[in-house]
Amino acid sequence: DLFALAAYLKEHAHQFYNNIDVTSFLLDVDAGWTFHSSIPIGYGAGSSGAYSAAIYKRYSVEKDNDLEHIKSDLAVIESYFHGNSSGLDPLVSYSDSAFQIVDGIPHRKEIEPEMSALFSLKDTRIPRHGAPYISLFKSKMENKELSNKIKTTLNPAVHNAINAMLIADKDELRKEFFKIRYFQL
């Protein structure tokens, strides 16, 4: 409901570094504005991030280019869909760039095209929403045994996969992806 989103943006206006022109947003909604994306909506694959980025790109008034401020603003918008957000997914969509977070600060990273080509989204046509899975994950993290396995097995594999991606090491990336897939079984 775009009208509910507009009300949310107005209610949270004090949280933005860059103001959001809610009036123009409402006028466009009244005029039939819609969102089109190649990311399937409602599958938990990043559509809320793309949607948040599109709103921000079109309706943010001041253009403070500080990445941390933009990420924070985008987190406020995406929180409408999930209850909370790091802002990273919409930042990736907004800037059409990859980022590495170092000490909580986003740093833009170039990814070699042949590395990006290793990934694709498959539309299963099975709608899903990310929020219930996020809640389930948080509740399962209360299990100390699982939490420890994630910290000692999954997290290192994810970090190693990211590093392999950044240095364009396909063999290492495949090896780490195998570890990630195996962990999920």
Task: Name the predicted role of every residue range.
Residues 36-58:
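Glycine/serine-rich anion-binding loops at beta->alpha junctions
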